[in-house]
């Protein structure tokens, strides 16, 4: 009897659903922990390392906050939202720093089930919320970016807007004071956690205002909600924002009758003018330029040189195939289609769900702006599927028993989640660095000073700074074409030019931090170099760096190290492209060859490689189409780690070299085909 009473209590049922969905989400994320724990190479300092490259930026910031200081101009994320939260968790919990950054995403990202279930409960549809929570918490895209070890702001980047959506819907349905104060609170937290959410928050508030004007134009509380929410978008300090919001909230709560529409209109107009004057639209324009129009700021900042656009090389901002788009959002194409149908049906039944459109549309921008956006559509589409399933159950109950209906719903849910389970099983992401790489960089920390620089590609910038506690020229946040030019040049040109460029780029970068805002050092370091060395032709200046008699006039202020991991060969053609571009035209018109490959087949005395090249089994020549090309030399590498290799000359007039990696330490790269220019590069020679 007592059991039946508990089941009749809607709050206990709701709580049970939240707990079950949360535990389900966490357990699914523990699969990667279980799998990765089998590999010693994924461990450092007695804990699994993280799998997010950008995560090391926040880890560095948290580490510096724990230490209480960081070096000037070291690009540390000291004081950033995720670093701050990590710092406090480290201070108040008994867990190690490595364990905290490993598991934070596991537990925080799973909180997405709470607003999903609460939102569905506002429509008196708990089943809709429960099914949606199960699907959304582990759908391909959301899982990929919030799995264990994925230490990044993505762990709350969907949780927070779903809470905002929940309070907007609750405000529409209940018109309560709790929603009125909670709405700006969560918008403020979201903006602090993820400043790039500004555009989405503006869209949500704007749509809420339009909804108010259409359906609730005579209700004051909705206008006050818009004003309070808009105040969080201002650039003033958070404590001033909070004070103004609390005062206005208190005035409305205590003096509703005296706050007539004229006063509310004046407050709204003043808020709008303040936002415009404080540059409120600038963040929106930046996001549109970077992700939609693929603009590179370096082209705008520099009036002379046209650098390589980094957006052409980032997978996250590449256009995504439509089938992949559907799978990433809902686990499978069929579930996506049912979810879309369910969401349209949900909109017809409950018009307040129109507030979810900005989140859904942002996710659909993945078709143009890149696959990283798909996570936004995940919870909204999951709600559509949950609604469809709840309607399906209502139909079943009319024809069959409750037990039969429940069995059908459970079976359908499991069937829906099966592709997601398969994805989780197959998605075995490696850690960013191996144990050997992390240990090597950790050793460098004991050799180098904090003011020293490591010149490497931007992919490795954050983790290098974290493990070695040094400075870098580029990283995952500083990698415009004008930034990447210098490490690209140092890695892909000859050793003499590499040494000179490494020294110049580091010293000029340090000088740029203290230069006036309108100084050429702030806009283009390369032009500043040319000015100081009395050079007007960029090609002649860069060529002069290869000459032994080139004299560096800039005083040496620190040591410089080069980090050139073997696996960088997989992306080295991209790395080189940044400095082989024609700086006057922006066109890559200086051809070079550097191509990694693995064998696909061997027949008739020929080796068919994955890059389309057909190599003779004696390695003396290769074919591209019908053209037979001679090989200059064969370089057999027995051990990259030990530096054991053998060079066999073949034709000294030929322009191409074949590297044969016997130990195959680099995945998918047993052969490397390169021309003489790449063979003489610092990356290959060193």
For the regions a language model picked out, list residue spans one by one.
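Membrane-embedded helix bundles of polyisoprenyl
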Residues: 22-29, 104-119, 128-172, 179-212, ...
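Juxtamembrane membrane-water interface segments that cap and precede transmembrane helices
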Residues: 91, 289-335
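Luminal/periplasmic acceptor-recognition loop/helix of membrane-associated glycosyltransferases
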Residues: 471-569, 586-634, 640
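Hydrophobic, aromatic-rich transmembrane alpha-helices
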Residues: 209, 247-259, 324-350, 686
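Extracytoplasmic
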Residues: 62, 66, 404-478, 549, ...
